[in-house]
Amino acid sequence: MHIQSLQQSPSFAVELHQAASGRLGQIEARQVATPSEAQQLAQRQDAPKGEGLLARLGAALVRPFVAIMDWLGKLLGSHARTGPQPSQDAQPAVMSSAVVFKQMVLQQALPMTLKGLDKASELATLTPEGLAREHSRLASGDGALRSLSTALAGIRAGSQVEESRIQAGRLLERSIGGIALQQWGTTGGAASQLVLDASPELRREITDQLHQVMSEVALLRQAVESEVSRVSADKALADGLVKRFGADAEKYLGRQPGGIHSDAEVMALGLYTGIHYADLNRALRQGQELDAGQKLIDQGMSAAFEKSGQAEQVVKTFRGTRGGDAFNAVEEGKVGHDDGYLSTSLNPGVARSFGQGTISTVFGRSGIDVSGISNYKNEKEILYNKETDMRVLLSASDEQGVTRRVLEEAALGEQSGHSQGLLDALDLASKPERSGEVQEQDVRLRMRGLDLA
């Protein structure tokens, strides 16, 4: 089982190579391209009996990322590789994506960046004399400057938190004596020459700038520590989901490449949209104790909603139920909530297919679009968190006895809802009246086009 927890920039390997380029002691180090013939010869091997093309491709894809992992671990002082290893019997759906392998490596690399920041701590008290005397040591091997630039590159590529990635990138580009910080992590370049030629005043200015950088690094470190802690908890949850649901959970991995949600969250959302939504919601709505599997799904979904931000604009979705729902007893203008998760759809046709008792039009901003994870992509599902407060703007029965309801997420406030004419802006087509037909339904349904049927 391979768990992806972080979504990263594809330039990670390049950045790490750049962080390590320069000189090794007195020897200049450069990248030398390996001849293609040698590469082919090195990669040639007899495939074990029964090993198919997909498995061999998977092993080839993961090899460079494992090599990066080894290199980074040695640089930052970690001698034991605990990262995921390619499995002989891994499922092709999981093992065939280079993106997944990269994310697995970055997941393991992020904790290592904390060790790099530890090694850089001496920069906070570095003196101008120490800079002149120790620059070669600081900028090579596991020296403070080298470790800092490498750790920041790892955070920029490996953090799942956008603010941390941005801050790490800004620090790498910070001008130290007129030279970007990331260039101070090598010897033999412009930074080395500057230290040799600098006046005592300029060296003091450089160390003052490094002191300021380290004060900002301390704040960044706190954010990374918090993220690493969350990653550890997420891995435990992901392992629990896989242990409980097996392949039914694993099949959802990789369904949200580049998304904000972790493996555990994606698996939990996927399992919910599959066959587990009914039992989980029934237990939540009836106040029953959740079983072990339901607790895992609920935990993962709750984490997903905590991480998700609100949409920039109000989203209109539709919901249908075969009977009543949690808002039956809520009067117009009042606020209520569903104790379970609230599934809605961007497609009104989906609401009609479910709606033999109640059809609702829902306006909100906090829903999660799970269509990319769900097996039923045509449902275009937007999922709201359990106990999301909704204000009932309209509730009336049509001539078929179906309750038509308009819900507005209560958190939107007065300026986003009915006071701005939201009801009148509904664009759902209503059926034309036939001559002589008695209209029993609430006149507001016809005026505002709320007839979905």
Curated annotation (Swiss-Prot):
GO MF terms on file?
Answer: GTPase activator activity; NAD+-protein-arginine ADP-ribosyltransferase activity; nucleotidyltransferase activity; toxin activity
Q: Which key words are in the record?
A: Glycosyltransferase, GTPase activation, Nucleotidyltransferase, Secreted, Toxin, Transferase, Virulence
Q: Which residues form the Bacterial Rho-GAP domain?
A: 96-229
Q: Which GO terms describe its cellular component?
A: extracellular region
Pfam families, per database record = ADPrib_exo_Tox, YopE
Keyword rRNA-binding listed? The answer is no
- Which residue positions hold the site described Arginine finger? R146
| EC id | 2.4.2.31
Q: Where is the TR mART core domain?
A: 239-414
Cited function: Bifunctional effector protein that is secreted and delivered by the type III secretion system into eukaryotic target cells. ADP-ribosylates several eukaryotic proteins including ezrin/radixin/moesin (ERM), cyclophilin A and several members of the Ras superfamily. Host Ras ADP-ribosylation blocks its activation by its guanine nucleotide exchange factor, thereby interfering with Ras-mediated signal transduction.
Task: Identify this protein by name.
Answer: Secreted exoenzyme S
Species name for this entry?
Answer: Pseudomonas aeruginosa (strain ATCC 15692 / DSM 22644 / CIP 104116 / JCM 14847 / LMG 12228 / 1C / PRS 101 / PAO1)
Q: Provide the organism lineage as a comma list.
A: Bacteria, Pseudomonadati, Pseudomonadota, Gammaproteobacteria, Pseudomonadales
